[in-house]
Amino acid sequence: MKKLLLAVLTIAFTFGATLAQGEGASEETRMTLRAELLRMINRDRAKFGLTPVQLDGQASAIADAYCQAQIRNRTTGHFTTDGAAPYMRYSFAGGNDGVSENAAAWSANYGFSDRALYDMMRRSEAAMMSEVAPHDGHRRTILDPAATHAGIGLAWERGEFRLTEEFIRRYVEWSRPLPRGVATSQPILCSGRAARGYDVEGITVHHEALPLPMAAVTANAIETYKLPESKREYLPRLKGRFTQRIAGGIEEVHEEYSDGSRGDFQVAPDGKFAFAIPLPDGPGIYTVVVWVRPHGSSGDAIPASNVSIRLERSAGALISGTR
């Protein structure tokens, strides 16, 4: 029953255009464009029988800040000069859910009229949806059947336009969220509950080195991202031995996973779980992914969190993670 749990990756678009040297973004225009892009996203999802995503205010604010940082640092894609991956950026800003990112960038040379902004946004969404496998990361992100919310970031200034879509998978209600920074490698207690109708399938903890600052040219050369391969997998505790009635008598059942283990953490019938997350691999970024699955389903498990925890090389402050 041990399973390989795969993470989502996405790709970034960069466009050149004979568009815009113009004014900075106004909040009214941004809100109008955001609502229109959400309509486009849900239109595209509806064509494939998928439920609409709801606009998420927190994720939109995170995406806006990232778009502004991209223009400030002259970067495109998923990384800016701090070296943080998208899931780190979302988590360190307070996000507790699963997240996958699409990004588009335009460089321009005339004024940003409302019509020009709308056209860049429309063409970005259309280009993403026109992708063909296997190079269809944006399209698959938009059409993720597990996405429940979306954050939409927009920024334009000095002839640059940036658009970021953060697709959120919200299936865990955290009663004890994980911190975002710790000073020691002691296990960290967390607890929560899976959304009604979903079961907790497992927890993976991915480890990677602390991000390092990078030049804009280096950040712009990175076209994709994914969680690191280095990970540890933890599974719900099984019942152990129990009896069940069968034709002609009673049999004893002994539950175990394929490696002979009985699991690592308790999950209650109502979906509540608690686990002390180990941090055994030294300093770095530990990203905690809680996997859930619709009750009774044999389909793919859903990565319902991307919570990144920073363990410094030396003692540091503890930062609470909230939503």
Over which residues does each language-model region extend?
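Short beta-strand elements
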Residues: 294-323
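Positively charged n-region of N-terminal signal peptides that target proteins for export
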Residues: 1-4
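A well-ordered secondary-structure block
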Residues: 85-169, 202, 206-208, 250-251, ...
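Second-shell loop/turn segments in exported
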Residues: 21-32, 46-56, 73-76, 101-116, ...
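Bacterial N-terminal signal peptides
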Residues: 7-14
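Short, compositionally biased P/S/T/A/G/V-rich stretches that sit at domain boundaries
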Residues: 157, 166-195, 210-222, 322-323
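Short, well-ordered surface patches within globular domains
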Residues: 23-95, 136-151, 159-160
